Amino acid sequence: MQLDKYTAKKIVKRAMKIIHHSVNVMDHDGVIIASGNSTRLNQRHTGAVLALRENRVVEIDQALAQKWNFEAQPGINLPIHYLGKNIGVVGISGEPTQVKQYAELVKMTAELIVEQQALLEQESWHRRYKEEFILQLLHCNLNWKEMEQQAKFFSFDLNKSRVVVLIKLLNPALDNLQNLINYLEQSEFAQDVAILSLDQVVVLKTWQNSTVLSAQMKTLLPADYSKQDYKIAVGACLNLPLFEQLPLSFQSAQSTLSYGLKHHPRKGIYVFDEHRLPVLLAGLSHSWQGNELIKPLSPLFSEENAILYKTLQQYFLSNCDLYLTAEKLFVHPNTLRYRLNKIEQITGLFFNKIDDKLTLYLGTLLEH
């Protein structure tokens, strides 16, 4: 590990709060990279060079400082060790007899901060590479051998069935995203997390059953989140090997989210199992088969027939219940009958024929 300016500044700030003397931190070349006296930055410190070369504490009094042409100020300089190696020097400015009492305390403070920073970097590295592993699983970019090797490294059990959950932030910001990630990665949740974008996060939940998953969704996000902050989409849980299961669960979660945002914008959670048919049909929307299916309905997509198309949608949303549909549309049942007859005339499809009725229904589900 190399001592960087960020860590050096933390050492100076923490040490000077304790001892109220100016503190300098020098890198492995003896150059001052952080100091309580900003005018000394980027200067080569002779005492630090000597401390590094000989791996010892170097005390500089007024006479020695003068001998060195004040390339170093009076003070005491101690090597900073990490894993048995010298990575820099911490120096306390002042007469050695006055500041010597603080030397070991400052050295210990510096080395603790270095160890803490190294641990944070390791955790950051581990998180970043595990996130990359998860994303590769979702996009099916690994062969079986690579998957086994990386799964073993990250203690990722390939035998556990999982379901993909997508979280979409409606007010994305870097702070919001980081706070959410910190919450989701708490060990008590036992789940894997990856960032897709500034406004989307993916969570892998171990699949037990739909009842357990439903209960987990209630605590998926922090308690202070409101429905105005997010949307959640739960993908399919498929009885397949994990390398097939996760990409398909991810795709179904994406399709479920797209469908939910368009057709149920007021809801906060969209579950694949609750919207199975329209989500599975999503792949047909822009295919030649899909175009053929909706071709008879194309006149209904015009602005002048918008009310008829809305009526058709509500009719199927109401499970073909004539009176419930009329109630939802705030019209008389006879008005509804007139509209349904009009739809039959325009499309040439009839509600009392099963194939025609299915075509009409699919036409309300497919994108156009």
UniProtKB/Swiss-Prot annotation:
InterPro entries: CdaR-like_regulators, CdaR_GGDEF, Diacid_rec, PucR_C-HTH_dom, PucR_C-HTH_sf. Coiled coil: none annotated. Transmembrane segments: none annotated. One of its GO terms (biological process) is positive regulation of DNA-templated transcription. GO terms for molecular function: DNA-binding transcription factor activity. It comes from the Bacteria. Belongs to the CdaR family. This is Uncharacterized protein HI_0093. It comes from Haemophilus influenzae (strain ATCC 51907 / DSM 11121 / KW20 / Rd). The lineage of its organism: Bacteria, Pseudomonadati, Pseudomonadota, Gammaproteobacteria, Pasteurellales.
